[in-house]
Amino acid sequence: MKFIDEARIEVIAGDGGDGSASMRREKFVPFGGPDGGDGGRGGNVYAIADRNINTLIDYRYAKKHLARNGENGRGSDCYGKGGDDVTLRMPVGTVVTDMDTGELIADLTEHGQQVMLAQGGAGGLGNLHFKSSTNRAPRQKTDGKPGERRMLRLELKVLADVGLLGMPNAGKSTFISSVSNAKPKIADYPFTTLAPNLGVVRVGPSKSFVIADIPGLIEGAAEGAGLGHQFLRHLQRTGVLLHLVDLAPFDENVDPVAEAKAIVGELRKYDEALYEKPRWLVLNKLDMVPEDEREARVADFLARFEWDGPVFEISALTGQGCEALCYAIYDYLAEHSDAHRAAEEEDLATDVRFRDAPPADGGATPGGDA
């Protein structure tokens, strides 16, 4: 299935039904009085997170989603039926934003989480509500309110604890396949990875974390070079970034330091907050460097790169150094997970408008119009 991580849709909630202006007309009941019922409420549009869906491809082609209108009220105190709701199933990790106002509507981070996207209009009042001691036969009634109409932007940001950064062919896919059960495509040409891959790394019976591999970046990605830098959105939820560097490039004219600096520059162009995220340097392909040259090459790289953060030397192909790196990652995440989760919850509390969402009366398949 084609991986789609962005879509734009229009959601239209149902209009409320009009109230009825009716009088009771019945044999042997003179002056029966008003009996016009209220209109039904318009249907709502909900989004629900579903872990069985992993792409937004359904919403790339079905762009308009409508809930049903409420029925009009009728005589004999008959109230109109409420419009059926529409439920849109989306992948866990989907962020929903109002394109007109920029408001963050929802951040679907848990399976089954349900959020209202558009609220149906209230039904109008029938004339029985306007009866009084001075107006025994009112003919007033109110019309139903229109439902909300919104243009929404959907963005899928995968849920991972660790993100991999690096140039094409830096060994990211080889690394994730060596430490997890993920089976990404691996080849000796650039841009083998075309979509994010997730792998679960287990360091104990009940100790694990999720790692995300995204397509490689090159210098100028912010201007559209290579595959661009839009895949960096999938690293925004991570707790730590691993910057993989090919320490033994096949082309002798390639400078690993220049490539590493280019990656950092692209990261900063995309998002300052992502640039400030904890980042570890992972020097890969040490098995390709002669043992007597390794220490000098590593020292030269660190000096020219001007790096004073955590450094790990590994070979993703042979597994050298990978186990120690995974244990260090788990220990770091365990130590900082509470603070990371608290920060995310604080952001949601201030930026996301969650509305109470009762169980939907009706639903629609992903991408289906009501």
From Swiss-Prot:
Its cofactor is Mg(2+). Its EC number is 3.6.5.-. It holds the Pfam family GTP1_OBG. This is GTPase Obg. Residues 160-334 form the OBG-type G domain. The lineage of its organism: Bacteria, Pseudomonadati, Pseudomonadota, Betaproteobacteria, Burkholderiales. Belongs to the TRAFAC class OBG-HflX-like GTPase superfamily. OBG GTPase family. Keywords: Cytoplasm, GTP-binding, Hydrolase, Magnesium, Metal-binding, Nucleotide-binding. One of its GO terms (cellular component) is cytoplasm. The gene is obg. GTP binds at residues 166-173, 191-195, 213-216, 284-287, 315-317. Residues 1-159 form the Obg domain. SUPFAM superfamilies: Obg GTP-binding protein N-terminal domain (SSF82051), P-loop containing nucleoside triphosphate hydrolases (SSF52540). It comes from the Bacteria. Its main location: cytoplasm. Residues 344-370 are annotated as: Disordered. An essential GTPase which binds GTP, GDP and possibly (p)ppGpp with moderate affinity, with high nucleotide exchange rates and a fairly low GTP hydrolysis rate. Plays a role in control of the cell cycle, stress response, ribosome biogenesis and in those bacteria that undergo differentiation, in morphogenesis control. It is found in: Cytoplasm. HAMAP family: GTPase_Obg. Transmembrane segments: none annotated. GO terms for molecular function: GTP binding; GTPase activity; magnesium ion binding. Monomer. One of its GO terms (biological process) is ribosome biogenesis. Mg(2+) binds at S173, T193. InterPro entries: G_OBG (IPR031167), GTP-bd (IPR006073), GTP-bd_Obg/CgtA (IPR014100), GTP1-OBG_CS (IPR006074), GTP1_OBG_dom (IPR006169), GTP1_OBG_dom_sf (IPR036726), OBG_GTPase (IPR045086), P-loop_NTPase (IPR027417). It comes from Burkholderia ambifaria (strain MC40-6).
